[in-house]
Amino acid sequence: MESCSVAQAGVLTSPFMWRWTGMAGALSALDNTIEDDADDQLPCGEGRPGWVRGELLGSQGVCKDSKDLFVPTSSSLYGCFCVGLVSGMAISVLLLASDFRKLDFSRPEPCFEKEASLWFVAQH
């Protein structure tokens, strides 16, 4: 059974201010990274998806028209997930801290991708 617990909890719970990177398309295609127009440093709001939604959608160009933002409780520090409009088409967008690789997050936990995929299917 896969665990969605957060390792390195002492590091992750610090109030980091992260710049967000948007990854559009398939959730597994993390090498296809697009830098969104995110000039603001956005806090990754652990356990506060409503607050994250307001901050994130106000600053993220690719998700500015999104009505929903999915933040799994177990993985909220790894990133968020939303549906955004790109060239007029609604696509899934995975949002991660731009320095997530430096923080030794090679990719989001598998449970994050699974939960996000199920959420996306339920919304459409």
Curated annotation (Swiss-Prot):
It comes from the Eukaryota. One of its GO terms (cellular component) is membrane. Keywords: Membrane, Transmembrane, Transmembrane helix. The chain crosses the membrane at residues 77-97. Expressed in gastrointestinal and immune tissue, as well as prostate, testis and ovary. Expressed in lamina propria and eosinophils but not in epithelial cells. Expression is greater in benign adjacent tissues than in colon tumors. It is a single-pass membrane protein. Its main location: membrane. It is found in: Membrane. The keyword Acyltransferase does not apply. This is Colorectal cancer-associated protein 1. The gene is COLCA1.
